[in-house]
Regions:
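Aromatic "clamp/platform" in nucleotide-sugar-dependent glycosyltransferases that forms part
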Residues: 266
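A charged, aromatic-enriched C-terminal amphipathic alpha-helix characteristic of glycosyltransferases
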Residues: 322-353
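Conserved acidic donor-binding segment of nucleotide-sugar-dependent glycosyltransferases
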Residues: 245, 298-299, 303-309, 317-323
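Short acidic/histidine- and often glycine-rich active-site loop of Leloir-type glycosyltransferases
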Residues: 233, 289-299, 303-304
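Active-site donor-binding segments of glycosyltransferases and PAPS-dependent sulfotransferases
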Residues: 28-93
């Protein structure tokens, strides 16, 4: 499902773009592709194949739209039935449509994501989840097993992500971390203002932690477009400035000038926010778990904490005392390992071993 070319779509789009540059004919198949995204894919020389699955959720609420489209597949195999006339795929980056493929790139099962994030959602969401939880978990297990049968090699986007799929009995053969375009995400200034802390507002955000930090006098700027998940009360906080959805160039500036990036999450298989921040030279304060815990090095390119209370305490400490300038240099250095060129080379090696290219 492609509503934009950002986020979880990046691994597919970046690889497709590089393969097109090498003279390959590339198609991307999706149950839903919004017109703007479709136009951009065409401009890149990628053939978009929009299966045109009808949906009732708003295209502007990508999380609900994704869940609706996933339910169609989980219950009726609807999306895969529409894709039957298409050629077998080389790589399946999707969790909502399945055709025979060599590789399946895993980015996280929805049932485990819902289990983690539900505590921060509204009462109505919690009630609906309590009723639907057994069915969602059963369907998710069935989808994962079906996806495994359609693919020969399964590759996860992090060690934590691989561990989630192993709970369903799926064998994961390798790890390839998602790519970052360091031509875009790089420090935009050599003299950052460092007069605010940057954070992200989304369905995975622990708003209670952000509010406690703001209550203690820390100036916070927040970006994000998933407004239906945002605690409306927090938007009126005097120490919180909500930027909404911002352009990539503005986001790079926001990362580059922040004192640090605050990332209190409930569920994150990989975590683009800390990585983008690192690449812009700004360390991240987050939890020592899941995806971010695999690439944040405590005291080097960020800080890892074990609890909400420790995060609040550490955020205030950094706000008041700062940190060594070397941490910014370390952030940029550590982000090199995630450059899209390295990501593409790993895939080229994989594809070459199966004589695909």
């Amino acid at each position: 499902m492609i509503t934009s070319l950002e986020g979880s779509v990046r691994p597919a789009v970046y690889l497709a773009e590089d393969l097109v540059a090498r003279g390959c004919d590339i198609s991307i198949i999706s149950p839903v592709i919004l017109p703007d995204a479709e136009s951009k894919l065409c401009e890149m020389g990628i053939k978009p194949v929009n299966l045109g699955v009808r949906h009732f959720s708003s295209a502007f609420d990508s999380s609900l739209l994704w869940f609706e489209v996933w339910m169609y597949e989980a219950l009726f195999n609807l999306n895969s039935k529409r894709a039957r006339d298409e050629s077998p795929a080389t790589i399946n980056f999707s969790h909502v449509v399945f055709v025979p493929s060599i590789f399946w790139y895993l980015q996280g099962p929805p049932s485990l994501a819902l289990r983690d994030i539900i505590s921060g959602l509204s009462f109505s969401f919690k009630m609906a989840y309590a009723f639907l939880k057994p069915m969602i978990e059963y369907l998710d297990g069935r989808v994962v097993k079906r996806g495994g049968k359609f693919s020969s090699i399964r590759i996860a986007n992090s060690k934590f992500c691989a561990s989630m799929y192993s709970k369903f009995g799926l064998k994961v053969h390798d790890i390839i971390y998602p790519p970052l375009d360091r031509r875009i995400f790089r420090p935009s200034t050599s003299r950052p203002s460092e007069d605010y802390v940057l954070t992200y507002f989304g369905k995975e955000t622990k708003f209670s932690v952000i509010k406690k930090i703001a209550d203690l006098g820390v100036k916070i700027k927040a970006f994000g477009s998933k407004t239906s998940f945002i605690d409306k009360g927090i938007l009126k906080h005097p120490n919180i400035e909500y930027l909404g959805r911002i352009s990539t160039s503005d986001l790079v500036d926001a990362y580059s000038n922040a004192l640090f990036t605050l990332f209190p999450f409930t569920h994150e298989p990989f975590g683009y926010i800390p990585l983008e921040s690192m690449s812009c030279g700004t360390p991240t304060l987050t939890y020592n778990m899941q995806g971010p815990g695999e690439y944040i090095i405590d005291g080097e390119n960020g800080w890892l904490v074990g609890s909400d209370a420790h995060m609040v305490e550490k955020a205030v400490e950094i706000w008041r005392e700062g940190y060594p300038a070397r941490m910014r240099r370390c952030c940029v250095k550590e982000s090199l390992a995630f450059d899209r060129e390295i990501y593409v080379k790993k895939w080229l090696k994989m594809l070459g071993s199966f004589s695909v290219i």
